[in-house]
């Protein structure tokens, strides 16, 4: 019984630290012309947030235009990764 509790506590600690690390993985946020945002993670993959603050699907390779007119290409489609960060209260990258 004691061993099961220790294993459970270990798993909980690892899960909590993994969530905290994921929050810090957003290094850049681009505001797009349509009001949505693209968040870039440390590994270069991206997640898309709509103008209502919800993560959304964006096909890899899609060309998007930022508010200042810069064009960027979607790399990856980190819906679940971004959704987790948004649910934890993350709204802006570095």
From Swiss-Prot:
Keywords: Copper, Metal-binding, Periplasm, Plasmid, Signal
Any one annotated GO CC term: periplasmic space
Induction trigger: By Cu(2+). Maximally expressed 30 minutes after induction with 0.4 mM copper.
Major place of residence: periplasm
Underlying gene: copK
Subunit structure: Monomer in the copper-bound form. Homodimer as apoprotein. Dissociates into monomers upon copper binding.
Organism: Cupriavidus metallidurans (strain ATCC 43123 / DSM 2839 / NBRC 102507 / CH34) (Ralstonia metallidurans)
Protein name per the record: Copper resistance protein K
NCBIfam families attached to this UniProt entry: peri_CopK
Localization: Periplasm
Example GO molecular function: metal ion binding
Highest taxon, organism lineage: Bacteria
TM regions (residue ranges): none
The keyword Transmembrane helix belongs to this UniProt entry's keyword annotation: no
Signal peptide start and end residues: 1-20
